[in-house]
Design a protein with these regions (language model features):
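Transmembrane beta-strand segments that form the barrel wall of outer-membrane beta-barrel proteins
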Residues: 247, 280, 306-316, 322-324, ...
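C-terminal outer-membrane beta-barrel translocator/porin domains of Gram-negative envelope proteins
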Residues: 269, 307, 407-561, 566-570, ...
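Repeated loop/turn-to-beta-strand initiation elements of outer-membrane beta-barrel proteins
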Residues: 274, 306-308, 319, 331-338, ...
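Residue-level signature of outer-membrane beta-barrel architecture
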Residues: 328-330, 357-359, 394-396, 443-445, ...
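Transmembrane beta-barrel wall of Gram-negative outer-membrane proteins
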Residues: 351-352, 357-431, 437-439
């Protein structure tokens, strides 16, 4: 031990005290320490901290059209007129000064300025201090472009860049306008033969004396290009032979990025890729027209080819109907799908298998072959049917809704059906062999496949058929349908439908009941049961006819994802080969719609207006898609 001051010579030092036991004790292990931080004054917060109120005033931005934009971004306004204290109000006001200046510069007021002022209203008994925050903006002069210069090499046509650049001398130096003009060049260039066009950094030289700005933009156009070949990489789903079915361009055609996007969309629509990219690649090959051939690199990655699907519906007279499907979209590559379908309903049961080749040698052309067994039991007839069919079709798709579509094919059907024999006065069962060549042509001038809002559609079905039941009887089934859609407003669509059908060359009683025409149901005249319209037997059951006419009008009102649809339908089926137009049956009702990405879900309730004996007072229909 030592002392602070030395002891005088000859003095005796005091003995050293015994050690304090606390100092010699072992240290507490680190794990035993309490690590909770000590509370400080700054940490103690009042559950009800004092608040001040303030009002916000903006001045000077209305005349340049920026007041609304400033208000939507203002820190003062976003604070809701409340702050912890006056210092916070002042800090928000400073933020809003800078905001006003940024907005002014964005539309060409580069000398713009803004100041803020905070005024306090003296408190009165029972009334706390209230502040008034005022931000005053001074726009200053508007800067305009004195010149516009695009620096690039030669292009074809020579005005390709200038004609598609929406800036000219005298325009205000407005950020959004400049960015939009530059973006347009990046769109137009690849659409017109320049897939590698790049925009450099713009330069705007301001002159505060004028006040103007000289605008310069470097543009690297790259080579003018034409389409070359398709090449592929990755885990291939399709080989080059099938890939070359999809392009809507030919080798040597001037490059257009829209056609590249279309190719990518068409490949994605097959549903067979987990990822896919289509990118132009320089080749250095020069074509006869001086353009460089650009190959398209298709990088593929396989996706899951199998899927399960299902639909459900209900309608008066048809009951519940459930359908489930299993699909392997690429079992027989390329795009050879196997589809197994099972129908389970209160009045219909069936099983079918379909082979479908999509994009069969031509884009959007489909070949399908189906084998199906079905049992159905309705008031009109019951039938046990086996069908073999094949069909070629040219279809619309979500990425290309075609004006003209069609299908044609062949069908062989064996069916055992019950029918009412008027000569015997009772129901009997007969077996029919039917061969048919069904065809359909549709002209579509509507704006949407699933939920049209304007335009019209015309559809013609013709099916030459032969029926063998004792002897062979040839005949022709025809159907003509037209629909029209008119947009009254953004939320109201008027829709109408007319349909007429005729069967020529055979007597009704020689025709299999399943091939006759019937009226009534969700896709026909709502308010009446499925197949209930037309001639009846003595028991009041429908027997069908050789002709049909129908009409419908709907008002489709939509609000958000929901809709209400009042409607009126009319129609009937007749024993004669041509519809008479007499004895029309009318139904009216109202429906609800829930709109989804794959079409509207429909619930319709209808009542017959001139009901017959045995007709229900109310009919209900549930399904996907509009009625027409």
């Amino acid at each position: 031990a030592t002392t602070t001051n030395p002891a005088p010579t000859g003095d005796t030092l005091a003995p050293i005290a015994a050690a304090d036991p606390a100092l010699t004790a072992p240290l507490t292990p680190l794990a035993g320490f309490d690590t909770t931080p000590l509370a400080t004054a700054a940490d103690i917060q009042d559950k009800n901290p004092p608040q001040v109120r303030y009002d916000t005033v903006i001045d000077g931005l209305e005349k340049v059209g920026l007041a609304a934009q400033w208000k939507s971004l203002s820190a003062l306004r976003n604070g809701g007129g409340k702050a912890a204290n006056g210092v916070q109000v002042q800090a928000r006001a400073k933020e809003d000064e800078a905001l006003a200046v940024r907005l002014l510069k964005s539309i060409g007021y580069y000398d713009g300025s803004a100041v803020s002022a905070i005024e306090a209203t003296p408190p009165t008994p029972g009334t706390p201090t209230r502040y008034k925050a005022t931000v005053t903006a001074t726009p200053g002069p508007l800067y305009n472009l004195s010149s516009v210069t695009l620096q690039s090499g030669p292009v074809t046509p020579t005005d390709l860049l200038t004609a598609n650049f929406a800036l000219k001398a005298g325009d205000p130096i407005e950020a959004a306008r400049i960015q939009g003009a530059e973006a347009n060049l990046q769109i137009v260039g690849p659409h017109q033969g320049y897939p590698f066009l790049k925009i450099g950094d713009r330069d705007v030289l301001l002159d505060d004396k004028t006040p103007t700005g000289a605008y310069t933009l470097p543009v690297d156009t790259g080579p003018r290009a034409s389409f070359g070949r398709l090449v592929t990489a990755g885990d291939p789903v399709f080989g080059l032979d099938h890939l070359n079915v999809f392009p809507r361009f030919k080798e040597g055609q001037l490059y257009d990025s829209g056609k590249t996007d279309d190719l990518r969309d068409a490949l994605n629509a097959t549903g067979l890729f987990s990822s896919l990219s289509v990118q132009p690649q320089r080749t250095g090959r020069t074509g006869p027209d001086g353009t460089e051939a650009v190959d398209l690199l298709v990088t593929q990655a396989k996706g899951p080819p199998r899927s399960l699907g299902g639909t459900a519906g209900y309608s008066t007279g048809q009951g519940f109907r459930l359908e489930g499907t299993y699909t392997h979209r690429n079992l027989f590559a390329p795009e050879g799908a196997l589809i197994a379908s099972l129908v389970a309903g209160t009045q219909e049961q069936g099983l079918s298998g379909t082979f479908r080749r999509s994009n069969a040698g031509k884009r959007d052309r489909t070949f399908s072959a189906t084998a199906a067994a079905n049992h159905s039991s309705y008031d009109a007839f019951s039938a046990d049917t086996f069908t073999l069919s094949a069909r070629w079709s040219y279809d619309s798709t979500p990425i290309w809704q075609k004006r003209l579509t069609y299908y044609y094919g062949g069908e062989l059907t064996g069916t055992n059906e019950s029918m009412y024999d008027f000569a015997r006065g009772e129901r009997v069962r007969r077996t029919y062999g039917i061969a048919a060549l069904p065809t359909q042509f549709q002209f579509d001038h509507s704006d949407d496949l699933l939920n049209p809002t304007k335009g019209y559609r015309l559809r013609l079905n013709v099916s030459p058929e032969g029926s063998i039941q004792g002897s062979a009887r040839p005949y022709v089934r025809t159907m003509l349908e037209g629909t029209m859609y008119k947009s009254v407003s953004s939320s109201l669509i008027l829709a109408g439908r007319l349909r007429a059908g005729s069967i020529l060359g055979i007597d009704r009683d020689d025709l299999a009941p399943s091939r006759r025409y019937y009226g009534g149901g969700g896709g026909s005249v709502r308010g009446y049961g499925f197949q209930r319209l037309g001639p009846l037997d003595p028991n009041g059951d429908p027997v069908g006819g050789r002709s049909l006419n129908e009409g419908a009008v709907e008002a489709r009102y939509r609000f958000g994802n929901f809709g209400i649809v009042p409607f009126i339908d009319a129609g009937n089926a007749y024993e004669s080969s041509f519809p008479k137009g007499s004895d029309l049956r009318f139904g009216a009702g109202i429906g609800g719609r829930f709109y989804t990405n794959f079409g509207p879900f429909r619930i319709d309730a209808a009542t017959p207006l001139n009901k017959r004996k045995g007709d229900s007072k109310l009919a209900l229909y549930l399904s996907l898609g509009q009625a027409f």
